[in-house]
Amino acid sequence: MGMWCTTLFMVSCVSICLILSHVQEVEAGAPPQDCWNLVTFPAKCGIHGKKKCFKEMESKYQQRFLQCTCKNLKPEPKSPKDEHDCTCQRANPYECNS
């Protein structure tokens, strides 16, 4: 009887430890997804479009970006202005909503 109680106690302790460690992992959650911003700016991309987008986006958001792409937009018939889209990945995905 004494050995059975000791074994049951040990199994209970191990089970509780495993359950608690799993709960802590679930509460921590998965890391956030990459955060991308797309903004349209006036003028064309030019030769150094990526650098231009880095500067424009960092100026607009006051944050650091990891990578950017620049894409010239086709002018609409009503608007003769040249425009480009900057798509950039934020360095800190936790600041995605700001």
From Swiss-Prot:
It holds the Pfam family SCRL. It comes from the Eukaryota. Coiled coil: none annotated. Residues 1-28 form the signal peptide. Disulfide bonds join 35-96, 45-70, 53-86, 68-88. Keywords: Antimicrobial, Disulfide bond, Fungicide, Plant defense, Secreted, Signal. Expressed at least in stem, root, rosette leaves and flower buds. Transmembrane segments: none annotated. InterPro entries: SCRL (IPR010682). The keyword Membrane does not apply. One of its GO terms (cellular component) is extracellular region. Its main location: secreted. The keyword Secreted applies. It is found in: Secreted. One of its GO terms (biological process) is killing of cells of another organism. Belongs to the DEFL family. This is Putative defensin-like protein 233. It comes from Arabidopsis thaliana (Mouse-ear cress). The gene is SCRL22.
